[in-house]
Amino acid sequence: MCIRDRLWIVDSYSLVLSALLVPMGAIGDRIGRRKLLLIGSTGFAAISALAAFAPSALMLVVARALLGIFGAMLMPATLSIIRNIFVDATERRIAIAVWASGFSAGAALGPIVGGFLLEHFDWGSVFLLAVPILIPLLILAPIMVPESKDPNPSPVDPLSILLIMTGMTGITFGLTHTSETGFDAVAISTILAGLCFIVLFVLRQLNREKNDIQPMLDVRLFRNTVFTGAITANLISMMVDVGFIYFASQHLQLVSGLPPMYAGMLLIPGTLAIIIAGLVIARVAVHFHPAQVVSFGLALHAAAFAVLAFLGAHNDLVIILIFIVLGTGIGIAQTISNDLMLSSVPPRKAGAASAISETSYETGTVLGTVIIGGMLTAVYRANVVVPDGLDETLADHAHETLGGAVTVASQVGGEQANQLLSSAFAAFDSGVVLSSAFSAVLMGVMAVISYFMIRKAPREMKPADH
């Protein structure tokens, strides 16, 4: 399997997912969120089973793209169902905290379970794992989850769907391409084209409202500073969080030499911090203004990265402790920001609003890889010193990434290997320090901005019902 095939296998899912989140959110409002959840779960389980036995790289790319379609059904449906079931503010926040904890637990357990499966079974077992997880959902959801939908849905607008799909695909492809090859003509042109289609989508929504035609997405929501502040806080925090996981996983596996399974286990305390902080803040947030809570959570982000920038990633204990502080900030900020986002819209539009939230998460994930990951890689390449006498091909490989340096060192051995690893580890740590300092400043600024954007929210956020 060539490198290009591997890239498409990885990227096809996120490309399709990001393109379809907003349309699927609107479809859920129209046909029913529970129905969309069941369709998405059934399709995701079925395609996962097929992907496990894909006979070629092309078929695996197609399977991953199909998983993106059904994944786009699942993500906004779950959050919008919470919006419609839980009216009481405290109960809704607890439900959101549990919902967010599921994603966090999945992110932490993924490397552990995936590493175990790949160590003992064929690669297809990773896809098969989704099947037994989704079967209980398919059995229990029709019994336990009530149906909800928009009683007056907007008419289907194929042009709006095409515009948002094309726009998000262009932006996501361009950013993903940037993380792999840098800002070249392809990346710049696709990002700009994507932004143009997004502008056309917004103009069409405004035009439909002007002509008293219900739009697919009420873009006027972004005039609400509380809604926009919550969405922006989620996007930026996700960007730096992904950046942390990006270099933490490399440190644990490449510098410390831990297998993926054990590296993932060291991240469990931080994941538990996310879960506990979310559940606790859901109950005590009633005593504080939402702006104070979100800003405090983002400030914890800034503090964690500031300490990491000062100390550097010299040992595993630093990584673990930093992730605990960071996880606490994640649990606090994202639980309340998601509640603010959901409460800012009427129940009938919960699907579309949830899709915007999920899109911000996906965009933040890509930006984390591009910006934080790109910064880390650039600093590494500027500081790593390759020993003299090394084969040119091997030298280039070692100069590209830390993983490349570790691979080359294992091949050459001896004093050259020791010199290369020493230089590579120092260069990588320099990248961690700079990217952490950047993240600390960014989150400090975001903590202040989010406070002023969200402070207009009432102390006890009541769901919009109009």
Which residue stretches match the model-derived regions?
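Interfacial helix-cap and linker-helix signal at transmembrane-aqueous boundaries
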Residues: 27-28, 113-121, 175, 252-253, ...
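Hydrophobic transmembrane architecture of multi-pass small-molecule transporters
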Residues: 136, 340, 361-455, 460, ...
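Helix-loop-helix hairpins in multi-pass membrane proteins, especially solute transporters
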Residues: 26-159
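Loop-to-transmembrane helix entry/capping segments in MFS-fold secondary transporters
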Residues: 89-99, 260, 347-356
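Structural signature of transmembrane alpha-helices in multi-pass secondary transporters
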Residues: 13, 17, 68, 97-107, ...
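Transmembrane core module of solute transporters
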Residues: 4, 8-16, 122, 159, ...
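Hydrophobic transmembrane-helix bundles of small-molecule transporters
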Residues: 97, 119-233, 240, 258, ...
